């Protein structure tokens, strides 16, 4: 059992009640939680009577979650794995899949993981703790590619200015700490009194998404979920910024036959829908939840219900996403 004061216990999963209601019925259901994190959704699903296969690419999250495995054995399996590979962990179709996209609050709270500029730590940001770091990206990528990352993945209006500043500064002293990069961006862009959002927020978001290939991971995860859900099964996705939410919206729209094509393109044969939406649009946090959990402010939940149709092609182009240079191909 989780001990009082444990980080996992302090974690509050966002939109929990809408998620549970949207994935019902759960008694005896086989559910994949593709983003275990601190275990908030998994515990709630287990308490509702489900059998859960939980995945997380972060080895720390998997270690911390072993007490939950012991508590709910044999109804819980917890594995270190990217959720894009969830189709490899089941032999039979499942009743539901839930994905909570992005960094967990547990990762944000640990300064040494380097996800947050609010707590100074190394420029790391790796969820799986393997591969190149955010520091590698900042100190080694070409200026133009940095600007593109900040612009596309962070929707940062000052992307070019910030990239030029980074290129100039790193020649003298490389960026090694989150606080150093955040202060440099704030000094360049400025911050008006009363501004709620720190000027480095979007750059840090972009770096985290790039380091962990979160866009590619989400696309592959949506395709994988489509392949493992039984007819009537439900896919719930919680996202925290517009980039992710647009991808999820576009996926459900395309899979339900709702994607609009250009009038200049030739007509194509209609394909059977593999999903239909449980509700129109996205669910957001209630006033009560916003008061209890400010992190839920930007959360959006979309749920699709699987039809009997065969899976469609796994075409990454349906997301209409701009290409970004690979780390190896962009190093200066």
Swiss-Prot record:
Classification via Pfam families: Methyltransf_5
Broad class of where this protein is predominantly found: cytoplasm
Taxonomic superkingdom: Bacteria
rRNA processing among keywords: yes
InterPro entries, per the entry: RsmH, SAM-dep_MeTrfase_MraW_recog, SAM-dependent_MTases_sf
GO cellular component, as recorded: cytoplasm
Function: Specifically methylates the N4 position of cytidine in position 1402 (C1402) of 16S rRNA.
Protein name: Ribosomal RNA small subunit methyltransferase H
Record organism: Bartonella quintana (strain Toulouse)
Lineage of producing organism: Bacteria, Pseudomonadati, Pseudomonadota, Alphaproteobacteria, Hyphomicrobiales
């Amino acid at each position: 059992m989780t001990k009082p004061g444990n980080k996992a216990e302090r974690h509050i999963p966002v939109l929990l009640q809408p998620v549970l209601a949207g994935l019902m019925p759960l008694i005896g259901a086989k559910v994949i939680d593709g983003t275990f994190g601190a275990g908030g959704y998994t515990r709630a699903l287990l308490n509702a009577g489900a059998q859960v296969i939980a995945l997380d690419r972060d080895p720390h999250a998997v270690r911390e979650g072993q007490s939950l495995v012991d508590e709910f054995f044999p109804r819980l399996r917890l594995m270190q794995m990217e959720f894009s590979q969830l189709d490899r962990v089941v032999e039979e179709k499942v009743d539901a899949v839930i994905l909570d996209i992005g960094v967990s609050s547990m990762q944000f709270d640990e300064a040494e993981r380097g996800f947050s500029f609010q707590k100074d730590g190394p420029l790391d940001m790796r969820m799986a703790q393997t591969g190149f770091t955010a520091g590698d990206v900042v100190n080694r990528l070409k200026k133009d590619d940095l600007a593109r990352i900040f612009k596309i993945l962070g929707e940062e209006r000052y992307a070019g200015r910030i990239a030029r500043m980074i290129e100039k500064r790193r020649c003298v002293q490389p960026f090694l700490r989150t606080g150093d990069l955040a202060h440099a961006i704030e000094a360049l862009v400025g911050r008006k009194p009363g501004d709620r959002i720190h000027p480095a927020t979007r750059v840090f978001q972009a770096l985290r998404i790039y380091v962990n290939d979160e866009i590619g991971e989400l696309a592959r995860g949506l395709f994988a979920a489509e392949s493992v859900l039984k007819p009537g099964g439900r896919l719930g996705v919680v996202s925290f910024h517009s980039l992710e939410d647009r991808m999820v919206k576009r996926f459900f729209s395309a899979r339900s036959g709702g994607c609009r094509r250009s009038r200049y393109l030739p007509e194509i044969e209609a394909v059977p829908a593999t999903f239909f939406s449980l509700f129109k649009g996205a669910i957001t946090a209630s006033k009560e939840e916003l008061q209890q959990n400010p992190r839920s402010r930007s959360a959006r939940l979309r749920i699709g219900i699987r039809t009997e149709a065969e899976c469609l092609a796994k075409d990454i182009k349906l997301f209409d996403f701009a290409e970004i240079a690979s780390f190896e191909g962009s190093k200066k």
